């Protein structure tokens, strides 16, 4: 498969270093194997797993490479549209990052570092461990609530923080009972859990999303499910399914020891600010201004592989 020849025929003005950067990105998405065909790009879940661990700028570069090669080979339009939706969302995220980086007075007043949020999680963890829960059959309400706080704190410090999509959420162990309109913790076994997200902001363009659960969070959830057998992942004070609004309030309450008013949006902004190369993004904005085109056009022209 002559990728370079095909890309040059489709994009004759594309520089060699750009093409080389695209080929490097594609090879990485193909498990560092030489590319014999483009079938691996149809495995959306595998590609998503590889992208999830990358920085925003790198994700954009890789998806740009995917789109360039798919278009060069006149690939399936639905597959091209799928990756176009991803790049559009990444561009939207970029715009959000740039706007949020200029903090409002309210954000500035409540801004903290991720390390402060982690301190709250560690403090709750110490309290839970002191309860010796593994040797107890039932919990009193205060201990039960503290355990759920531990779960919620883990959801938003041990994972890149998504929105309030963990509530409402069902716990399900049979895939046949999972529909395409609700959110689930799929419990396939002690070490076989994933979050299945159907209802979220961009569900119309991206469809069902599957979130892997890291080992530490998996252990916390195992402990939680030992005492929570309701079939609902998170609960309100009446032991009924927690709402998204209730989860938002719980997050603010749980992180109150920081002395700040931590909302889900602020929490996400803090995470982004510490995990995205703002200097590189600002440089892109400045370059766009110097070249008299918009950042959106800048993103569509060329993404340098980092």
Predicted segments, located by residue:
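Conserved tyrosine-mediated DNA breakage-rejoining catalytic core shared by Y-recombinases
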Residues: 168-215
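A short, glycine-centered helix-capping/turn motif at helix boundaries
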Residues: 146-149, 155-178, 278-282, 291-292
């Amino acid at each position: 498969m002559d990728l370079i020849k095909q890309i040059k025929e489709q994009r004759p003005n594309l520089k060699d270093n750009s093409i080389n950067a695209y080929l490097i990105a594609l090879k990485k998405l193909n498990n560092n194997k030489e590319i014999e065909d483009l079938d691996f790009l149809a495995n959306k879940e595998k590609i998503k797993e590889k992208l999830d661990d990358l920085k925003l700028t790198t994700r954009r570069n890789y998806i740009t490479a995917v789109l360039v090669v798919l278009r060069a080979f006149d690939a399936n339009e639905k597959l091209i549209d799928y990756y176009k939706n991803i790049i559009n969302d990444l561009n939207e995220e970029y715009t959000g990052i740039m706007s949020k980086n200029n903090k409002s007075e309210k954000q500035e007043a409540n801004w903290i570092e991720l390390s402060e949020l982690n301190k709250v999680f560690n403090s709750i963890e110490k309290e839970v461990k002191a309860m010796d829960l593994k040797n107890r059959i039932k919990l009193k309400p205060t201990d039960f609530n503290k355990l759920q706080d531990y779960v919620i704190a883990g959801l938003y410090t041990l994972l890149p923080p998504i929105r309030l999509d963990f509530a409402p959420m069902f716990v399900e162990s049979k895939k046949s009972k999972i529909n395409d309109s609700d959110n689930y913790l799929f419990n396939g076994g002690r070490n076989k859990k994933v979050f299945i997200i159907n209802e979220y902001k961009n569900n119309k363009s991206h469809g069902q999303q599957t979130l892997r659960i890291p080992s530490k969070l998996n252990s916390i959830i195992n402990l939680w499910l030992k005492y929570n057998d309701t079939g609902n992942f998170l609960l309100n004070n009446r032991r009924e399914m927690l709402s998204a609004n209730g989860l938002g309030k719980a997050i603010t309450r749980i992180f109150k020891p920081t002395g700040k008013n931590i909302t889900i949006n602020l929490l996400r902004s803090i995470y982004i600010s510490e995990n995205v190369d703002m200097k590189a993004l600002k440089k892109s904005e400045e370059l766009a201004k110097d070249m008299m085109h918009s950042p959106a056009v800048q993103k569509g022209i060329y993404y340098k592989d980092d």
